[in-house]
Regions:
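N-terminal segments that cap or nucleate solenoid repeat domains
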Residues: 2-57, 68-72, 201-248, 253-260
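A structural signal for leucine-rich repeat
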Residues: 139-141, 163-169, 190
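Extracytoplasmic/secreted cell-surface and envelope-processing proteins
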Residues: 159-162, 185-187
């Protein structure tokens, strides 16, 4: 039989194990919508999860955040976890769009899959050394421009059940911090190693890249001044490879989102987005993907030579390219 307890002070609901004297924090569903898009009754901006809860004079140790326990808690910005938590269930923080920072407790052993899906505001997360297992797609469907910093405290990489996102470019947009002297161990890992991506600007061309040190691939990204104005002007040829400062060669495989937009700090209808200089561009055969709104508002762009091997042309790639033929 299932036994439940609701803490009246904060509304948190627990499933109690009478034999083990443990408690699991579970979800509280609110109103339902289509496709299981129900709201959460956890409406506060901050929750402090206790180490123990008491029901009818019996204490229960809180050891787990259940699956989807904070699902769609749209106001949630901060959660403080006790040292007693050993497991975080699948999808525990899905759609917590305001959650910005999370310090996971030492003693945590397992993090479930898709735990931080759609956490669009998440900026920092620390994974303690005690974590030994992480589910697949942990950061699935997050925004590339979040600039998430993931700090791992263990000297050896935790086991990961699969890629952390369905999008391969995820690793190029976020940062992994590991203990000093442990970089080699993480670089060798098939998943963690994908995070070893560095920014590099080719002074000869002015092109800015995200370099993946593991795959030896490059993504061409926006290069802007302090006001967000694009530094790309009359460019018409993009090279297939780039060498970093150490002479290591990387193959260009992708053009990033809004790469040639005139200004990235303006609204989509603002004229300062316009790039009025670029007229033609030739892309190398190594490019497999062109990102979202890559050439948006390149008003005088007339000719684009796309590679035959191109696999993905993202939405709004040539939006408002009013001079482009055919």
């Amino acid at each position: 039989a299932q036994h439940y307890y609701v803490d009246e002070s904060n509304g948190l609901k627990y499933e109690l194990d009478y034999e083990k004297h443990t408690a699991e924090l579970i979800e509280q569903q609110g109103t339902s919508g289509s496709n299981f898009d129900y709201s959460s009754l956890y409406s506060a901006e901050k929750y402090v999860v206790p180490s123990y809860v008491a029901d009818e004079g019996v204490r229960y140790k809180v050891t787990k955040l259940g699956a989807s326990c904070f699902y769609n808690a749209t106001n949630l910005k901060e959660v403080v976890l006790p040292a007693t938590i050993e497991e975080i269930g699948n999808g525990a923080f899905i759609r917590c769009r305001e959650l910005k920072k999370l310090q996971l407790n030492e003693g945590l052993k397992k993090i479930g899959e898709q735990c931080f899906k759609y956490t669009y505001s998440l900026e920092q997360i620390t994974i303690p050394a005690s974590v030994t297992e992480i589910g697949k797609l942990l950061f699935n469907l997050m925004k590339n421009n979040q600039q998430l910093t993931i700090t791992c405290l263990s000297s050896s990489p935790a086991e990961v059940k699969g890629d952390m996102s369905i999008y391969s470019e995820f690793y190029a947009h976020h940062t992994l911090v590991v203990p000093r002297g442990c970089e080699a161990a993480y670089k060798k890992h098939p998943i963690w190693g994908k995070f070893f991506v560095t920014d590099y600007t080719d002074t000869a061309t002015g092109f800015k890249y995200k370099l993946n040190a593991t795959a030896k691939t490059a993504i061409l990204v926006r290069n802007t001044d302090a006001d967000g104005k694009s530094l790309y002007t009359a460019t018409n040829y993009v090279p297939s490879t780039v060498k970093d400062g150490n002479g290591v060669e990387y193959v260009l495989t992708e053009l990033g989102d809004h790469c040639f937009v005139g200004n990235d700090k303006r609204y989509a209808w603002d004229a300062e987005l316009n790039n009025e200089i670029l007229q033609s561009i030739v892309l190398p055969p190594t490019v497999k993907k062109i990102g979202w709104a890559c050439f948006n508002r390149c008003l005088n762009l007339k000719d684009v030579q796309l590679p035959e091997q191109l696999e993905e042309l993202s939405d709004s790639c040539f939006a408002v390219c009013i001079s482009l033929d055919g």
